[in-house]
């Protein structure tokens, strides 16, 4: 089984019996955050793959206009890959499977938070930003999914305005603890779906990076890890870059505490796993362990999108 992540932090993982091997493409091509395009889709790390007749499971964050499918087609044609699966709605499930597999838990509630994953059918500006799963050694069950179009309704306009960022930060801090007139909810297959125009922690940190210019690759990629570190030097008031980072850090901490409390209503297990790009936030991760004294926490050691190739391989062998 071969998992291939075609998102940012591109990676491959192949599983044979109980042995897993994982490779980050940036270690091979020396290009940080590299992700494939239709014009530039070749992986140097593919030289590690021994058998292209294996089953390939592709993962991605959800590009627009069928770009994921087009990239996968190019890769499969070049390497004559005949057996493959790509399900655009599995991004957060792969995060959860990867994290659970390397934890010591037999049961857990996995919370995935990032800047956007699968797109909602027929409403493609809404991307999956928060998810809660119950997971054990036999099954993974979706309990809650939040889809946000904040990237389109808010993000692309006037993000250099620091006052706008401060207002958005206050909204995120209270986001899950009050009813929003602009939210919509529905239940499908025992999972509660939320459609919102609001930001989550991943989107807010991306907005912060654009506001204070923590960007790489000609502005194409945000550097939220640097913003999280910068927050340690700031105040929870003021307009300096480090002050804004501190305010975002505190707002997203409150948001995540609310989400953890929500997760604990779905099952009696006391085991919580955090994954998705926002789980790179080491400072806030520690704070959750102090807030929830009787909860066992496990933080995905590879919570960014690179880990989804690992999760895809695990999902295929254990949960399909």
Region spans (language model):
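Short acidic/glycine-rich loops and adjacent helix/strand connectors
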Residues: 1-320
